[in-house]
Design a protein with these regions (language model features):
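Glycine-rich phosphate-binding loop and adjoining beta1-alpha1-beta2 segment
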Residues: 84-88
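N-terminal capping/interface segment
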Residues: 1-20
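Structural signal for interior beta-strand "rungs" in well-ordered beta-sheet cores
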Residues: 16-83, 94-99, 106-166
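C-terminal segments of enzyme domains that contribute to small-molecule binding surfaces
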Residues: 93-94, 101-131, 163-210
Length: 210
């Protein structure tokens, strides 16, 4: 059986990590077996290199589910990357509160707050994709290479482009409903192992109950 609390799941491969085991920020929550591969930087530096503008003052969260696959260079762009579009100027005056005799607690008025980034389970995020603040990605979705995701992605939907748009659904509606109902990623490791042939063959009819 696999061991979910190790850092490197593959012998001799230090470019791939189980992400949960290298995260220290309490505002980043990662599910078991979700992996990140990086052939440019140390994958253990995910917090610093891939989760951007994620400042404690916002209390915004990155939540990623179980069994996700995140490719090299994928980025999660948080609220502090924004500037306010509702004010007359996009210049972040509150950020320079000392210069302009403003109240320090109003720093967050420098940007529009879109909320957390939430990634479901069994999601594949492609090479150098960018996920914006406030986006929710459904279970089983695929994010294409260098896609810029500015809107929510439905479950089991493939998206790509700038900005990312739906390309196709991975399965028919009946199969998607079945997958969302059985939620295989919540099974025990033993039940997953028993059903790997069916999972890899894309055949829900062959699922074995235990």
């Amino acid at each position: 059986m696999p061991i979910s609390n190790k850092i490197y799941p593959r012998t001799g491969d230090t470019q791939t990590v189980y992400l949960k085991n290298v995260i220290t920020n309490p505002n980043i929550k990662i599910g078991d077996y979700t992996m990140y591969n990086d052939f440019v930087n140390d994958p253990k530096g995910f917090e610093q290199n891939n989760v951007l503008y994620h400042y404690p003052i916002n209390h915004d969260k990155l939540i990623i589910g179980i069994f996700c696959s995140i490719a090299c260079g994928a980025k999660f762009l948080f609220n502090s990357a924004n500037h306010s579009m509702s004010s007359l100027s996009t210049y972040p005056f509150p950020l320079f509160f000392e210069e302009w005799a403003l109240d320090k607690k109003d720093v967050i008025k420098s940007w529009d707050n879109k909320g957390d980034i939430i990634v479901g389970n069994d999601v594949w995020i492609g090479y150098e994709a960018v996920i914006f603040a406030g986006v929710k990605i459904g279970d089983g979705a695929i994010i294409g290479t260098r896609a810029v995701v500015t809107k929510d992605v439905p479950p089991y939907t493939v998206v790509g482009g700038v900005p990312a748009k739906p390309i196709k659904k991975r399965f028919d509606d009946k199969t998607i409903d079945t997958l969302l109902d059985i939620r295989w990623w919540n099974w025990s490791d033993e039940k997953i192992a028993l059903n790997l042939d069916a999972i890899q063959a894309g055949c829900v009819e062959r699922i074995v109950e235990v």
